[in-house]
Amino acid sequence: MLKLFRPGWGEGDARYEAGKAEAVYAAGLPAPAVHGVTQVGERFGIVYEEIVGRPLMESLQRRPWAVHETGRFLADLHLQVHRGRVPSLPRVEDRLTRAIARAPGLSENERTALLALLGRLPGGDAVCHGDFHPGNVYLTERGPIILDWMDATQGNPVADVARTAVLLRAAVLPQGMPGRRVVELIRRAFLHAYLRRYFTAAPPAPEQLDAWMAVVAGARLAERIPGEEKRLLALVQGTLCS
């Protein structure tokens, strides 16, 4: 399986991600094996083992009545990730700090408040995937495999849970999409089941979640995802003003 980077991304970018993926795989986490970095024309890429299976997202779409079961499954898999330790990974706090510093849409007071809030939140050394959602989980014969470790860090696992929650809460469905209302309801039910299972099984205090979600939402603004700004700012301001 070849992951090609966009034009303009260099060999160093490919080797950086490959190094993360190799470290995560060596730690025994459910990630694809890395077979090296290659170049195709002017683009660099990473050669991964071939993954034969289907995305968890497809399973959710085929079996919407099993939304709670699928949410619990994702939570159990996330708990497995958070039991991993990879000391070579960068700190999640550093990644969030850089993103908040350049995020558009924040007032300077909000930016300062988010950075101060981040500084008060407890740290940790758990592996954090950084982009953990049903589209990055594949169901295979040897069990679930998690793709796309480019944003992997180490830190407080609740930061990673918050990232997943923000991705699900802030994503905007296209206007006029058939069944849009139903999809929104399924997504909310999925998120509820995922969070309930995670915090039932894990020791971290769920009261940290709102604070981490505000910080993660502020950082997400730096990615400039079309249509998400209003929801992300609501998450930030709802916590800072409470």
Locations of the language-model features?
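An alpha-helical support segment within catalytic cores of ATP-dependent transferases
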Residues: 83-130, 138-141, 145
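ATP-binding pocket architecture of kinase catalytic cores
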Residues: 1-89, 122
